[in-house]
């Protein structure tokens, strides 16, 4: 497979997309959503092949859950695409404007990035999310999904390209790297003549490889250890309910809870309530102070080196007792708290201290970490959750897939 051919086609498509009307882009999105429903049988059959091969390969339950499509999930994906149609098109909008002393009218206008390359793992929904957001913002996309989702992604890309064709837009607006060859990923990372941004969605290894090898700007998204700290002033029953939601609702999600930090003053009653709620559902990994208070837990083991740096993506929860909010924050800083973190507290000072000093992309007071999501934030689908500080941070929606240009208008003005 010659990626240069894909790159040239994507760049050419990006020029046409940049001038496409909102109506034309929305037409393609509507067709995409309709075809996801109309072609559900073939999409789910392809996904069943991926699931069967994944089981044969010994994929974890968490990975299989990420890979799985069913009628309800496919319907939710189609609905997400329709929600993108409802969102304002940022392309062409003015960020700000002013009139200079020399009479020039100067504005910053949003424009597409150009060509976005996305490398991701066993999440077929990402294929549609990225295509929808890139299309709405006038960006072409080159996608490279994991080999675990090959058959699913092939069917989804057919739907996307058919929708583009029906709307009179180039099929090369969304292209897929079919071969799982790692060398092709390395080649994509060097294609700065054609690709304007790379977004890797996966584990720390993928992020490291992209940062070390890419000549294209990279936005790191998805990986990070999510924490909840329960302060001594918190309502314990309500805190347990939030912890259960953050851990159990969908443990394979990147915003699911990984580590629970508990203030020493309320550690015993909080952990008793938590164990009563989660026994049989969650395996606990605890440091010595916490473990000494958790004898009633059905599944409990000592925390080992590296456990508090682990994104579990499963029904496993790290637990640590801390002295106060400051120790909780220090623990988070030492253990890659870059994604989503929360404090349960009724103390306004501690809440503000946590919000102002936690280094995460999304920080919550008395709310689950599970809210870090483009749809939950009202952004529509998301292309990634950025855990870095440039160029975007948190869920990357439409505006985060644009840049801007300066536009100056005058009456034949020359600089003096």
Curated annotation (Swiss-Prot):
It catalyses: L-glutamate 5-semialdehyde + phosphate + NADP(+) = L-glutamyl 5-phosphate + NADPH + H(+). PROSITE patterns: PROA. InterPro entries: Ald_DH/histidinol_DH (IPR016161), Ald_DH_C (IPR016163), Ald_DH_N (IPR016162), Aldehyde_DH_dom (IPR015590), G-glutamylP_reductase_CS (IPR020593), Glu-5-SA_DH (IPR012134), GPR_dom (IPR000965). Keywords: Amino-acid biosynthesis, Cytoplasm, NADP, Oxidoreductase, Proline biosynthesis. It is an enzyme of class 1 (oxidoreductase). It is found in: Cytoplasm. It comes from the Bacteria. Transmembrane segments: none annotated. GO terms for cellular component: cytoplasm. Pfam families: Aldedh (PF00171). GO terms for biological process: L-proline biosynthetic process. One of its GO terms (molecular function) is NADP binding. The keyword NADP applies. Its EC number is 1.2.1.41. Pathway: Amino-acid biosynthesis; L-proline biosynthesis; L-glutamate 5-semialdehyde from L-glutamate: step 2/2. Catalyzes the NADPH-dependent reduction of L-glutamate 5-phosphate into L-glutamate 5-semialdehyde and phosphate. The product spontaneously undergoes cyclization to form 1-pyrroline-5-carboxylate. Belongs to the gamma-glutamyl phosphate reductase family. This is Gamma-glutamyl phosphate reductase. It comes from Vibrio cholerae serotype O1 (strain ATCC 39315 / El Tor Inaba N16961).
């Amino acid at each position: 497979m010659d990626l240069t051919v894909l790159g040239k086609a994507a760049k050419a498509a990006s020029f046409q997309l940049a001038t496409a009307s909102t109506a034309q882009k929305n037409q393609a999105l509507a067709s995409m959503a309709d075809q996801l429903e109309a072609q559900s049988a073939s999409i789910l059959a392809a996904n069943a092949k991926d699931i069967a091969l994944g089981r044969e390969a010994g994929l974890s339950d968490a990975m299989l859950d990420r890979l799985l499509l069913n009628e309800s999930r496919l319907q939710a994906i189609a609905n997400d695409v329709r929600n993108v149609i409802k969102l304002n098109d940022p392309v062409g909008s003015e960020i700000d404007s002013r009139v200079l002393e020399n009479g020039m009218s100067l504005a910053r206008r949003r424009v597409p990035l150009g060509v976005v390359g996305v490398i991701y793992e066993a999440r077929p929904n990402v294929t549609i999310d990225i295509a929808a957001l890139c299309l709405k913002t006038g960006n072409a996309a080159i996608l490279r999904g994991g080999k675990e989702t090959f058959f699913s992604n092939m069917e989804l890309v057919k739907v996307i390209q058919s929708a583009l064709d029906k709307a009179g837009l180039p099929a090369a607006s969304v292209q897929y790297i079919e071969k799982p060859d790692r060398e092709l990923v390395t080649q994509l990372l060097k294609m700065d003549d054609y690709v304007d941004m790379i977004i890797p969605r996966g584990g720390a290894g993928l992020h490291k490889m992209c940062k070390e090898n890419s000549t294209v700007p990279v936005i790191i998204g998805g990986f990070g250890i999510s924490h909840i700290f329960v302060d001594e002033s918190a309502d314990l029953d309500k805190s347990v309910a939030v912890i259960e939601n953050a851990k159990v609702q969908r443990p394979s999600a990147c915003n699911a809870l990984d580590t629970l930090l508990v203030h020493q003053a309320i550690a015993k009653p909080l952990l008793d309530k938590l164990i009563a709620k989660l026994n049989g559902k969650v395996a606990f990994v605890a440091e010595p102070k916490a473990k000494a208070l958790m004898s009633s837990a059905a599944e409990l083991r000592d925390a080992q080196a590296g456990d508090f740096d682990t994104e579990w993506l499963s029904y496993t929860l790290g637990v640590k007792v801390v002295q106060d909010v400051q120790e909780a924050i220090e623990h988070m800083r030492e253990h890659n708290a870059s994604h989503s973190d929360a404090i349960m507290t009724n103390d306004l000072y501690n809440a503000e201290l946590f919000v102002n000093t936690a280094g995460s992309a999304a920080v919550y007071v008395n709310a689950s970490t599970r809210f870090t999501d483009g749809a939950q934030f009202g952004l529509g689908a998301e292309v990634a959750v950025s855990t870095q500080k440039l160029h975007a941070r948190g869920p990357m929606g439409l505006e985060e897939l644009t840049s801007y240009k300066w536009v100056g208008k005058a009456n034949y003005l020359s600089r003096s």
